[in-house]
Design a protein with these regions (language model features):
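Juxtamembrane intracellular "pre-TM" segments in multi-pass secondary transporters
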Residues: 1-27, 41, 50-88
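Residue-level signature of mid-helix packing/kink "hotspots" within the transmembrane helices
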Residues: 129-137, 230
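Cytoplasmic membrane-interface "Motif A"-like loop-to-helix N-cap segments
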Residues: 144-158
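C-terminal ends and interior cores of transmembrane alpha-helices
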Residues: 158-177
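A membrane-interface helix-boundary motif in multi-pass transporters
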Residues: 29-46, 237-264
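Intracellular juxtamembrane helix-capping segments at the cytosolic ends
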Residues: 197-210
Length: 264
């Protein structure tokens, strides 16, 4: 468990562990819906998630037992605010979580929006991940050079939202021909730059929270990216059904749900 320096932060840490158990439970539910978990194994999976949460909570209590019973009081210069960690975790849900989700659905997006072969759609979708080679270290560099890391992270997060909004405008018929595909690829790479620069700027802040527990903080922030990815992908898997596509949605419904997903 992560060491915190106040009772308030202790309860904050407990609270920020709840989404881990919640998203694992949702994942179990989805696996049961698709038939991977049976009616007998589904309850076992939920019990395992509950057992993990209890074990994790006990680890937090054990690490901070001296703080809880009042035998250890941290001096002001040794304290840090857990809300800084929580902000980084929530930011990483937005950037890295959305990256994992978008990478998973982009081939389908290009395939059904432009009626492309699967191989070509996959190649075009790879441009989103390719930008990572430059964008993620650039995010950290920009954060260092500007000197105001919080504002940099906020600006890149807003750019991320604007980029996804632009991508949601790419629908069948709105961008056509080779020029339309090139425009879609350009918008994809532009959006990817903000997403992955945001990831770099987020982790540029991690070592500044508390040096003694930097590794644990980095682990928690990174794990929240997976929470975001599973959340977004669950929404993505349900969008065709919500849009009236039923269990076997048409290509038109899939294309429409792909565009709508970027607005999420």
């Amino acid at each position: 468990g992560l060491e915190v320096t106040s009772i308030r932060d202790f309860w904050g840490l407990i609270g920020m562990n709840v989404p881990f158990a919640a998203i694992l439970s949702v994942l179990c539910w989805r696996l049961q819906k698709v038939g991977f978990l049976t009616s007998s194994t589904y309850p076992i999976a939920l019990i395992a998630v509950l057992a993990w949460f209890i074990f994790q909570t006990w680890g937090i209590i054990r690490t901070n037992i001296e703080l809880l019973n009042g035998t250890k009081i941290y001096p002001k210069e040794d304290r840090y605010e857990f809300k800084q960690v929580a902000i980084l975790e929530l930011t990483y849900i937005v950037n890295f979580g959305s990256e994992l989700a978008v990478v998973s659905m982009l081939p389908s997006f290009f395939e059904f929006t432009f009626d492309l072969p699967k191989a070509v759609a996959g190649i075009l979708a790879s441009c989103y991940a390719f930008v990572n080679l430059i964008a993620r270290p650039a995010g950290g560099l920009i954060s260092d050079r500007t000197g105001n890391r919080k504002n940099t992270m906020g600006f890149l997060t807003m750019g991320l939202g604007f980029g996804y909004l632009l991508m949601s405008l790419i629908k069948p018929g709105t961008f056509t021909g080779s020029a339309g595909i090139l425009m879609a690829v350009f918008l994809t790479m532009l959006c990817s730059f903000f997403v992955q620069s945001g990831e770099g700027s987020t982790f540029a802040l991690v070592p500044l929270v508390k040096k003694r527990v930097t590794g644990q903080i980095a682990g928690l922030v990174g794990a929240y990216g997976n929470v975001g990815a599973v959340t977004y992908l669950n929404i993505y898997s349900l969008l065709p059904l919500w849009m009236g596509g039923g269990k076997d949605p048409s290509p038109e419904i899939i294309a429409a749900s792909n565009s709508a997903f970027f607005q999420v």
